[in-house]
């Protein structure tokens, strides 16, 4: 029987790239996103390519909806094997201007959503009496905090912490928990970050902030979704069975830890 993976935030960007790679690896795919229109487009595209994929619209920040997502996957495909907590949002705000609304939004999605995904998947693995793999979206900002990305950085440090804690507590149940830490990618998220940084600095033009970050990458290019998907593919495979609690940088040589 083919294995099953849930990927949250899978309608576009890195999440879509991860989902396509796992589909090519032979997984049944549950595509989750809150953007229903884009989600259904991605589901159609996947099915046209012959992938075993179904879409599920939900809000990852709601614990009950994360539990229902996992149950949907089990109903559709019989069991769950891999949970990729990819969904996340960003914000670009100077430290003195960060407010309650931004904090609530980012922590609800990036932190609560990841934790609730960990819990829902782990409980299903335990119920199945099977090993399972939980893979979280961290970031270079989970290793090093960045100016005007304070809230985002704080949420990704939290994701790294929950990844370590979950790995320690779930190891004796055969469940591994790891995270991938992307760097600078040409995605909608980075386009938004670039645009917001221009608003904060009159000397910048669109593309300048992205190029400034990219210029520091030692391997000489910005990140493609496939760079992240390759790591997630490994973490979802049996080859990674002896790795847990790690938040692995995949940034082309930008942050060194």
Curated annotation (Swiss-Prot):
The organism's place on the tree of life at top rank: Bacteria
EC number annotated for this UniProt entry: 1.1.1.304
Residues annotated as the enzyme's active site: 152, 156
Catalysed reactions, as listed in the record: (S)-acetoin + NAD(+) = diacetyl + NADH + H(+)
Residues given in the record as substrate binding sites: 139
Keywords: NAD, Oxidoreductase
UniProt keyword annotation of Ribonucleoprotein present: no
Keyword Transferase appears in the UniProt entry: no
GO terms under biological process: acetoin catabolic process; fatty acid biosynthetic process
Gene Ontology terms, MF aspect: diacetyl reductase ((S)-acetoin forming) (NAD+) activity; quinone binding
Enzyme's top EC category: oxidoreductase
One family name in Pfam for this protein: adh_short
Binding site for NAD(+): 6-30
Free-text function comment from the UniProt entry: Catalyzes the irreversible reduction of 2,3-butanediol to (S)-acetoin in the presence of NADH.
UniProt family annotation: Belongs to the short-chain dehydrogenases/reductases (SDR) family.
NCBIfam families registered for this protein in UniProt: 23BDH, PRK07231.1
Family annotation (PANTHER family): 3-OXOACYL-(ACYL-CARRIER-PROTEIN) REDUCTASE, SHORT-CHAIN DEHYDROGENASES/REDUCTASES FAMILY MEMBER
Protein name per Swiss-Prot or TrEMBL: Diacetyl reductase [(S)-acetoin forming]
Provenance organism: Staphylococcus epidermidis (strain ATCC 12228 / FDA PCI 1200)
